[in-house]
């Protein structure tokens, strides 16, 4: 992730990247509200909402407001992330070309009487594929002043937001079709990918910051080696904790073990009853929480020691 000598600081782009991070955090927060209020199926169709882009009275009914608002916000964020990627690559032509191809392919499929769901998935991935291909083909005629790392991460974030749109749509259509197990897996996957998307965008914003590009963050490799390794371990542990937590949340098993810190009503550390719900809860609220806490504290102490 090192900044290359050709990297240049652009204040407007750096500010925009930070704004996209904040917007992504806001969208994840809204998505969490959708789950908390069980509003995900308050709008049972997709990509439209009750057959419309702007259903009548959607603001007046709270669950519908949450779900439809989440969709509108997600669509806006998809556009923001796409613009960020094109800006990092310093080439707006792929954006225009991809838009034209996506519209043309969707229109062609519509003449064959494809369903709105098929049309939306086709539009998303024809746009993504064309955008990716155009970026690669035109990269020599429009060289970026930014490092390979930030270009790669911005492109990964673009693909991530396309994947999120697909997962969100499939989650609704699968549940509408009563494929409940598939819908549950998609809900968990959708929530976990959202956090990964946020991390990607935070990395992009960091790599575009003045401090990173100026190199004021740099330390010798010998000092960073142990910190880097422990940081990776902590990231993996936190993400596993996230996956288990999302699974518990979407299974509705947040109170599978209703006592804390004891996992046993009789006062023991281990749960008295063992099933998928209690075991997941114990792994998340006890083992995972302790492991992540120790790793993060160790990482902070190591960073402070190496920074002396």
Language-model segments: residues:
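Membrane-interfacial, low-structure loops and terminal tails that flank and connect transmembrane helices
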Residues: 1-10, 138-148, 210-228
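N-terminal signal-anchor transmembrane alpha helix
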Residues: 12-39, 236-248
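Interfacial helix-loop-helix junctions of multi-pass membrane proteins
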Residues: 34-43, 110-124, 166-187, 248-258
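Extracytosolic (periplasmic/ER-lumenal) interhelical loops and adjacent juxtamembrane/interface segments
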Residues: 35-68, 254-277
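Individual transmembrane alpha-helix segments
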Residues: 59-80, 274-291
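Hydrophobic cores of alpha-helical transmembrane segments in multi-pass inner/ER membrane proteins
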Residues: 76-84, 124-137, 192-211, 290-297
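Membrane-interface helix-loop-helix junctions at transmembrane boundaries of multi-pass membrane enzymes
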Residues: 88-97, 138-153, 300-308
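Membrane-interfacial catalytic/cofactor-binding modules of polytopic membrane enzymes
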Residues: 243-290, 296
């Amino acid at each position: 992730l090192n900044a290359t000598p050709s990297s240049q600081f652009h204040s407007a782009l750096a500010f925009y990247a930070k704004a996209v991070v904040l917007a992504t955090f806001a969208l994840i927060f809204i998505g969490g509200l959708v789950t908390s209020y069980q509003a995900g199926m308050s709008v049972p169709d997709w990509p439209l909402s009750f057959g419309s882009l702007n259903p009548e009275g959607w603001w007046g009914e709270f669950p519908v407001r949450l779900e439809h608002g989440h969709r509108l916000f997600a669509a806006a964020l998809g556009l923001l992330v796409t613009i960020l990627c094109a800006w990092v690559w310093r080439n707006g032509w792929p954006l225009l070309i991809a838009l034209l191809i996506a519209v043309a392919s969707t229109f062609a499929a519509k003449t064959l009487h494809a369903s709105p769901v098929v049309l939306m998935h086709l539009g998303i991935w024809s746009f993504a594929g064309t955008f990716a291909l155009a970026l690669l083909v035109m990269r020599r005629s429009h060289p970026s002043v930014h490092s390979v790392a930030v270009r790669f991460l911005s492109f990964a974030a673009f693909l991530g937001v396309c994947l999120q749109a697909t997962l969100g749509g499939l989650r609704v259509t699968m549940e509408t079709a009563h494929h409940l197990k598939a819908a549950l897996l998609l809900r968990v996957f959708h929530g976990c990918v959202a956090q990964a998307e946020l991390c990607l965008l935070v990395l992009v914003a960091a790599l575009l910051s003045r401090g990173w590009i100026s190199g004021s963050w740099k330390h010798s490799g010998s000092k960073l080696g142990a910190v880097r390794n422990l940081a990776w371990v902590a990231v993996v542990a936190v993400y596993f904790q996230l996956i288990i937590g999302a699974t518990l949340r979407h299974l509705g098993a947040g109170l599978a073990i209703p006592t804390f810190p004891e996992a046993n009503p009789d006062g023991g550390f281990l749960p008295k009853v063992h099933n998928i719900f209690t075991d997941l809860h114990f792994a998340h609220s006890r083992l995972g929480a302790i492991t992540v806490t120790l790793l993060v504290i160790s990482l902070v102490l190591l960073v402070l020691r190496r920074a002396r």
